[in-house]
């Protein structure tokens, strides 16, 4: 049974509220990452198991946030835990190469034909930062084309927003980003081939960086032929195509969005799933490009925690499981949940829409968006009220209208049916 709801204040969140008050005095906004600053205050998780979270007040939740994507097997997967524990017994950081990073590199490359060489880093942000440096170093060009609303981490070249017009030179999206940096990033709308063509017309673009599926405003899916069109245009203008698959990698398919949509990138960034819930990122691509990365070439990239043995062990264990056909079952459950929500929205005659692919999903409080500007028209406050109703019912969705929800291997039909019961009850408003 789902829990009843009156308001956020009816939940016992006393410990979380107290922790948040302490945290606000110690950390900016009381959190270590802005997305965690749930209004009016976040709940503090104490432990997790399978598809469930338990907070400091003893409340339990079915988790569809899944740490914003990495926990595709659910929490505390026994096989992953065993491999991590075995590695910790041997030591957890050496500052030397290990067999594990060779094995994980081989495994990833076996699933991604577009990746011939790979560099492991510690985060998705580091991966995209390195990808842009590699693209600029390889092509000798400075300009980058970025999709409006696409998220690629928290470094200067991608913390850029559009000015006015369909194709615009970017302006800083954060204080502290130099205007001289932002001017080298050109913004174009997603799903707009003409805007992409115009952006590359000057032939001074090093690369287009994009999420094949926009994960931080939805998800918003590519229209038929869009990714193929971007691939064609970049080739015509000698620009590299970077697919940021930090979210979609090993989620849409074992070969990620490139396998699912049958479009290959020149450079690919990965993260989240390939670390099994531990810090990781990776950038890979064609051999002729990646051979330019130090120490083999002159494009510098380095990091103390690159190739962390614990992350490598967790990543290998995760891929071992996904390769057994588990990913197909996860994606089947994703289809089942999306259809269930769509049926509820239709039965209730709501002006909402359901988006998603594979194990990604979202309810938009408005029409189905095709790009960032359309996504912004959704009812954000209405979604926040819905979020709290669902949380009171024991279901943790991502707290923003513009964050993707996820399904894991731990979410079975019974759990999803309980979730649909809550959706039916609380989408009524």
Curated annotation (Swiss-Prot):
Annotated CDD domains: OAT_like
Keyword match Metal-binding: no
Cofactor needs: pyridoxal 5'-phosphate
Recorded metabolic or biological pathway in which this protein acts: Porphyrin-containing compound metabolism; protoporphyrin-IX biosynthesis; 5-aminolevulinate from L-glutamyl-tRNA(Glu): step 2/2
Keywords assigned: Cytoplasm, Isomerase, Porphyrin biosynthesis, Pyridoxal phosphate
Modified residues (N6-(pyridoxal phosphate)lysine): 272
Record field: catalytic activity: (S)-4-amino-5-oxopentanoate = 5-aminolevulinate
UniProt entry tagged with the keyword Zinc-finger: no
Chief location: cytoplasm
GO molecular function: glutamate-1-semialdehyde 2,1-aminomutase activity; pyridoxal phosphate binding; transaminase activity
Protein name as it appears in the record: Glutamate-1-semialdehyde 2,1-aminomutase
């Amino acid at each position: 049974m789902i829990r009843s709801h009156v308001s956020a204040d009816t939940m016992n969140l006393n410990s979380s509220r107290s922790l948040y008050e302490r945290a606000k005095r110690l950390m900016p906004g009381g959190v270590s990452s802005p997305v965690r600053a749930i209004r009016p205050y976040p709940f503090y998780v104490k432990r997790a198991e399978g598809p469930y979270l338990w907070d400091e007040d003893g409340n339990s939740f079915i988790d569809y946030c899944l740490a914003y994507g990495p926990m595709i097997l659910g929490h505390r997967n026994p096989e992953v835990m065993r491999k991590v524990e075995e590695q910790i017994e041997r030591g957890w950081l050496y500052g030397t190469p290990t067999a594990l990073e060779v094995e994980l590199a081989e495994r990833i490359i076996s699933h991604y034909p577009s990746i011939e060489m790979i560099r492991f880093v510690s985060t998705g942000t580091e991966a995209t930062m390195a990808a842009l440096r590699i693209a600029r170093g390889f092509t000798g060009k400075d300009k980058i084309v970025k999709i409006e609303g696409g998220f690629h981490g928290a470094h200067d070249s991608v913390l850029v927003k559009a000015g006015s017009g369909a194709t615009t030179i970017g302006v800083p999206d954060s204080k502290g980003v130099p205007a001289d940096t932002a001017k080298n990033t050109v913004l174009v709308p997603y799903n707009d081939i003409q805007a992409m063509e115009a952006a590359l017309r000057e032939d001074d673009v090093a690369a287009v960086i994009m999420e094949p599926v926009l994960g931080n405003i939805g998800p918003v899916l590519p229209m038929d032929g869009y990714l193929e069109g971007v691939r064609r245009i970049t080739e015509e203008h000698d620009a590299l195509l970077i697919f940021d698959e930090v979210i979609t990698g090993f989620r849409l398919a074992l070969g990620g969005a490139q396998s699912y949509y049958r479009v290959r990138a020149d450079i690919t960034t990965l993260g989240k799933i390939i670390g099994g819930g531990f810090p990781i990122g990776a950038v890979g691509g064609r051999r002729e490009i990646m051979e330019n990365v130090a120490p083999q070439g002159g494009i510098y990239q380095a990091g103390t925690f690159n190739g962390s043995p614990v992350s490598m062990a967790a990543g290998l264990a995760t891929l071992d499981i996904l390769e057994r056909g588990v990913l197909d079952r996860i994606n089947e459950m994703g289809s089942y949940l999306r259809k269930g929500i769509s049926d509820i929205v239709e039965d209730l005659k709501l002006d909402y829409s359901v988006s998603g692919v594979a194990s990604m999903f979202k309810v938009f409080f408005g029409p189905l968006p095709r790009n960032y500007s359309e996504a912004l028209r959704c009812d954000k406050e209405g979604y926040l009220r819905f979020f709290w109703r669902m949380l009171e019912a024991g279901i943790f969705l991502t707290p923003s209208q513009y964050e993707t929800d996820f399904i894991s291997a731990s979410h079975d039909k019974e759990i999803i049916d309980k979730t649909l019961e809550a959706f039916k009850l609380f989408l009524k408003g």
